[in-house]
Curated annotation (Swiss-Prot):
GO terms for cellular component: small ribosomal subunit. One of the primary rRNA binding proteins, it binds directly to 16S rRNA where it nucleates assembly of the head domain of the 30S subunit. Is located at the subunit interface close to the decoding center, probably blocks exit of the E-site tRNA. This is Small ribosomal subunit protein uS7. Disulfide bonds: none annotated. GO terms for biological process: translation. Keywords: Ribonucleoprotein, Ribosomal protein, RNA-binding, rRNA-binding, tRNA-binding. Part of the 30S ribosomal subunit. Contacts proteins S9 and S11. Pfam families: Ribosomal_S7.
């Protein structure tokens, strides 16, 4: 284990929107260090949302999607006297954002549209409208925390 907490590395805002969350999203989307490909996919998805999204801009829908998917509670396994309990815990803001990004990307990859740009645009629109697989994942996480509320006193 570390002697002290690892310093939080600062992320530069993206060049087009000046948004740090988009940079983190692009970095999570990237495979094999191919950042230019990930950037093309991200900006392509935001442009596709601009065309489909009606009066809202792509960046607004992106921000709504991230906010809608952020979980406030999750469960962690805790062993007490031979039994393992799923203990509900609050999620730190940085982890909320990381989980939201991770869930949106993973469920976008599982979608059936042809290109990743289309998949990501559709998943972001669904997430912004509180539907889709990533929103269901958040709801399931809440249900798990709610079902195990009795073990909340085992928090550490």
């Amino acid at each position: 284990m570390r002697r002290r907490k690892a310093p939080v590395r600062e992320v530069l805002p993206d060049p087009i929107y000046g948004n740090k969350v988009i940079t983190k999203f692009i970095n999570s989307l990237m495979y094999d260090g191919k950042k230019s490909t990930a950037t093309t996919i991200m900006y392509g998805a935001l442009e596709a949302i601009d065309k489909k999204g009606g009066e809202k801009k792509g960046i607004e829908i992106f921000n709504d999607a991230i906010e809608n998917i952020k979980p406030l509670l999750e469960v962690k396994s805790r062993r007490v006297g031979g039994a393992t309990y799923q203990v509900p815990v609050e999620v730190r803001p940085a982890r909320q954002q990381a989980l939201a990004i991770r869930w949106i990307i993973s469920f976008a990859r599982k979608r059936s549209e042809r290109t990743m740009i289309e998949k990501l645009a559709a998943e972001l629109l669904d997430a912004a409208n509180s539907k889709g697989a990533s929103f269901k994942k958040k709801e399931d996480t809440y249900k798990m925390a709610e079902a195990n509320k009795a073990f909340a006193h085992y928090r550490w």
